[in-house]
Curated annotation (Swiss-Prot):
Entry GO terms, CC: endoplasmic reticulum; endoplasmic reticulum membrane
Record has Ribosomal protein as a keyword: no
InterPro entries: Rot1 (IPR019623)
Signal peptide: 1-24
Name listed for the protein in its UniProt record: Protein ROT1
Phylogenetic placement of the source organism: Eukaryota, Fungi, Dikarya, Ascomycota, Saccharomycotina
Species this chain originates from: Saccharomyces cerevisiae (strain ATCC 204508 / S288c) (Baker's yeast)
């Protein structure tokens, strides 16, 4: 009798684990999509960087975002604010944009190789730069020792945990868009040729009003969609299935 009850419990538990595995196998190991940090204010794409006017757009809160395609392209948007220990009223801030290709090695290491001429950084140090931020090119290859994709137990959404080259975990990222919200996966600002400056209109500066207008327009130029749980086996569905199976198992346990 006890052996039959124990076997029944094992079958029920096995069924639940199988259902969860089937649900997770297709997406749980995929970094495809746009991921954003907890502030949920920093996203890759045209809302962060305008490659035509080379304009970095400051989000409302600091944060980090990565996007990955299925064919090996990535994009990064970072907005960092750090305190100034000598003068707390003068925090330093930087906005960084990079994109390029990525590869995942057999041991799980994730390497991001940026397009050298496309990276941009806007650095602000208000107590030392007389109110004029420094805008420069930026090129930094990034290596993550490993990564892990899972489901947040509180929010029921996918999370991406990146580990730095020394194994230190970064802040978790949450899936925001799938397909990803990104700028074109090609060189956006190729090195200018000698003849590209012959046209006087190419050196004409745009007004601040036109730059701001363009940045606002860019926010809507994407085919990315907000990630929604469209699968039948969502995290809530798995919870209800497991609860139901445990309930049925309890009844069968008492009956036999």
């Amino acid at each position: 009798m006890w052996s039959k009850k124990f076997t029944l419990k094992k079958l029920i538990l096995g069924g639940y684990l199988f259902a969860q595995k089937v649900y997770c196998e297709d997406e749980s190991n995929s970094i495809y999509g746009t991921w954003s940090s907890k502030s949920n204010q920093v996203f890759t794409g045209p809302g962060f960087y305008d490659p035509v006017d080379e304009l970095l757009i400051e989000p409302s809160l600091p944060g980090l975002s990565y996007s990955f395609t299925e064919d090996g392209w990535y994009e990064e948007a970072t907005y960092q604010v750090s305190g100034n220990p000598r003068n707390p009223t003068c925090p330093m801030a930087s906005l960084i944009y990079q994109h390029g290709t990525y590869n995942i090695s057999e041991n799980g290491t994730l390497v991001l190789n940026p397009i050298e001429v496309d990276g941009r950084q806007l650095f602000s140090d208000p107590c030392n730069d007389d109110g004029v931020s420094t805008y420069s090119r930026y090129n930094q290859t990034e290596t993550f020792k490993e990564y892990a994709v899972g489901i947040d137990p509180y929010h029921g959404i996918y999370t991406l945990q990146l580990y730095q080259y020394d194994g230190t975990p970064m802040q978790p990222l949450y899936l925001a868009y799938r397909p990803p919200m990104m700028l074109p996966t090609e060189t956006l600002n190729p090195t200018s040729s000698a003849t590209s400056t012959d046209d006087p209109s190419s050196n004409k500066k745009r007004s601040l009003r036109s730059l701001v207008r363009r940045s606002l327009e860019n926010r809507h130029k994407t085919n990315a969609i907000k990630r929604q749980n469209t699968s039948f086996l969502t995290s809530n569905a798995i919870w209800y299935i497991s609860a139901g199976m445990l309930g049925v198992g309890s009844l069968l346990f008492l009956a036999f």
